[in-house]
Amino acid sequence: VSLTDEEIRLIQHIWSNVNVVEITAKALERVFYVYPWTTRLFTSFNHNFKASDKQVHDHAVNVSNAISAAIGDLHDINKNFSALSTKHQKKLGVDTSNFMLLGQAFLVELAALEKDKFTPQYHKAALKLFEVVTEALSCQYH
């Protein structure tokens, strides 16, 4: 998956106009409730999976920082996510399908937040972003 310059511009515009930690926390909460098996990776959260819970918020900060860094350098994302991919594979044992589940949850949250501003062009660009992120986070699995 590759992004056009226009899609990168749209992604940067979307990301700069939302509270990235808040939307990430909401996306994480959605994943935890819609796909409950994903919570097995977060036993330290003590079954507190709401966006407002401290552990979810703290993880949202980490995730949003990683996505923000990716958006800042989309042309070299595999290199930039190499260590994170290794951590998710070897240390945490994360199934790569979970990355796309989070991406889909982001799309829902962005659409709910942006409403009419979340045009088909924005949707396509955001979807491709999360496909690129998923590929990058999965690069050390192969």
Curated annotation (Swiss-Prot):
CDD domains: Hb-beta-like. InterPro entries: Globin (IPR000971), Globin-like_sf (IPR009050), Globin/Proto (IPR012292), Hemoglobin_b (IPR002337), Hemoglobin_oxygen_transport (IPR050056). GO terms for molecular function: haptoglobin binding; heme binding; metal ion binding; organic acid binding; oxygen binding; oxygen carrier activity; peroxidase activity. The keyword Repeat does not apply. Heme b binds at H59, H88. Red blood cells. Residues 2-142 form the Globin domain. One of its GO terms (cellular component) is haptoglobin-hemoglobin complex. GO terms for biological process: hydrogen peroxide catabolic process. It holds the Pfam family Globin. Heterotetramer of two alpha chains and two beta chains. PANTHER family: HEMOGLOBIN FAMILY MEMBER (PTHR11442), HEMOGLOBIN SUBUNIT EPSILON (PTHR11442:SF7). This is Hemoglobin subunit beta-1. It comes from Torpedo marmorata (Marbled electric ray).
